[in-house]
Amino acid sequence: MQKRHTFNTAQVMRRAEELIEASSNRYRITVQVANRAKKRRRLDNDDLEEGGMKAVMQAIVEMSDELAQPEIIGD
C-alpha cells in the first residue's frame, strides 16, 4: 500500500525553481540544497519511516522560506 504524503510536489517544484532563479549560480544553490539535505538526513534518520517529507524536499522548502535572507543564496 502506498503512503499518502501531506505535501504538494508541484509546490516543492515551484519553490525549487524560485531558488534557482534567485541564485546567480545554479550549481552553487544545488550544492547548498544537497548539503542541507545531507545534514538533515543525519539528524533525522527515521524521518521517512514516519511518512515525512524526504530530506531534499524539506531542504528546498526551508531554503525557499529563507529567500528573504540573502546570505542563504548570496554570492
Curated annotation (Swiss-Prot):
One of its GO terms (cellular component) is DNA-directed RNA polymerase complex. One of its GO terms (molecular function) is DNA-directed RNA polymerase activity. Pfam families: RNA_pol_Rpb6 (PF01192). It catalyses: RNA(n) + a ribonucleoside 5'-triphosphate = RNA(n+1) + diphosphate. SUPFAM superfamilies: RPB6/omega subunit-like. GO terms for biological process: DNA-templated transcription. Promotes RNA polymerase assembly. Latches the N- and C-terminal regions of the beta' subunit thereby facilitating its interaction with the beta and alpha subunits. Belongs to the RNA polymerase subunit omega family. In cyanobacteria the RNAP catalytic core is composed of 2 alpha, 1 beta, 1 beta', 1 gamma and 1 omega subunit. When a sigma factor is associated with the core the holoenzyme is formed, which can initiate transcription. This is DNA-directed RNA polymerase subunit omega. It comes from Cyanothece sp. (strain PCC 7425 / ATCC 29141). The gene is rpoZ.
